[in-house]
UniProtKB/Swiss-Prot annotation:
Protein name: Probable nucleotidyltransferase
Described function: Probably a nucleotidyltransferase, it does not confer spectinomycin or streptomyin resistance in situ or in E.coli.
Keywords tagged on the record: Plasmid, Transferase
UniProt cross-references to InterPro entries, sorted A to Z: AadA_C, NT_sf, Polymerase_NTP_transf_dom
Enzyme class: transferase
Gene3D superfamilies: Beta Polymerase, domain 2
EC number: 2.7.7.-
Keyword Transferase in annotation: yes
Effect of deleting the gene: No change in spectinomycin or streptomycin resistance.
GO MF entries: nucleotidyltransferase activity
Organism ancestry: Bacteria, Pseudomonadati, Campylobacterota, Epsilonproteobacteria, Campylobacterales
Length: 264
């Protein structure tokens, strides 16, 4: 059962849990994703955040963090939570893929319950997605930062890292767009906005941008995806047009990558 809770109250609560566990090792909690970019839908979005620490954390602390999130799972949005714990030094001195201490998400809950050592261990871990998450955190939004201001913690992420972080997921949309049209349509739009105009946009705002900057023959497809994203509607989509849109978007993206000689 999901208990509806004001999202800002939940953010404050998450921060308090983390501070209590980390004590002097706490730097801050930084929310990213659709919430930071202004298109959060509690029925379709998860709560994304990065926990930053001064020093490495041991397995006992890792388990305390995971157990606290599970203990309060019912307070999170329907899609749950996704978080990573990262050393402050790895937020300032960025290398790609970015190392992390701990990861947690709804997709990892069952494996955590079955065998904690799969999730909690001393292995060296890296995540290419963190470059994209850090880039979103660099979009100013003081309401999303708890602890030290994000501008004092996170360095600017090189564009080639951000592109590499998103590129394979974007390519997958060619095959996945029929099964997951809303996500793929809007993700292709916002990634093209990033590649072409260096814009960091939410999925919804990526759709708005595409209505003015991409082939208008697909405006109805994009509008349907935007409507479905922010509401409980389920528009129907023509599979052939979906695939054509994906192929055209990928072609535009690749042209920009090649023109700017961006490593992918």
């Amino acid at each position: 059962m999901v208990v509806q809770m004001d999202i800002y109250d939940l953010m404050k609560q998450v921060n308090e849990w983390v501070k209590e566990i980390l004590q002097d090792n706490y730097v801050g909690v930084y929310f990213h994703g659709s919430l930071r970019l202004g298109s959060f839908n509690p029925n379709k979005s998860d709560l994304d955040f990065i926990i930053v620490v001064k020093e490495k954390i041991d397995n006992e602390i890792k388990q305390l963090i995971w157990d606290k999130m599970l203990e309060n799972e019912q307070l999170f949005p329907k899609k749950g939570f996704e978080f990573s714990v990262v050393l402050e030094d790895n937020c300032r001195n960025i290398k790609h893929p970015i190392p992390y201490e701990l990861h947690g998400s709804r997709d990892w809950i069952e494996r955590y319950k079955e065998d904690k050592t799969i999730v909690i261990n001393d292995d060296y871990k890296v995540d290419p997605d963190l470059a994209s998450h850090f880039n979103v955190i660099n979009v100013p939004n003081d309401k999303m930062d708890f602890g030290k201001p994000s501008k004092e913690v996170f360095s600017k992420v090189p564009k080639e890292y951000i592109i590499d972080s998103n590129y394979s997921d974007t390519l997958d949309c060619v095959e996945e767009i029929v099964n997951n049209p809303v996500y793929c349509i809007l993700n292709l739009c916002r990634f093209y906005a990033l590649i072409r105009d260096d814009l960091t946009l939410s999925k919804y705002d990526g759709g708005k941008w595409a209505l003015e900057n991409m082939n208008s023959n697909y405006n109805d497809v994009i509008k349907n995806a935007m409507e479905d994203y922010l509401s409980d509607t389920n528009n129907s989509y023509d599979n052939t047009r979906l695939k054509e849109f994906a192929q055209e978007a990928i072609s535009l993206i690749n042209d920009c990558v090649d023109t700017n000689k961006i490593r992918k």
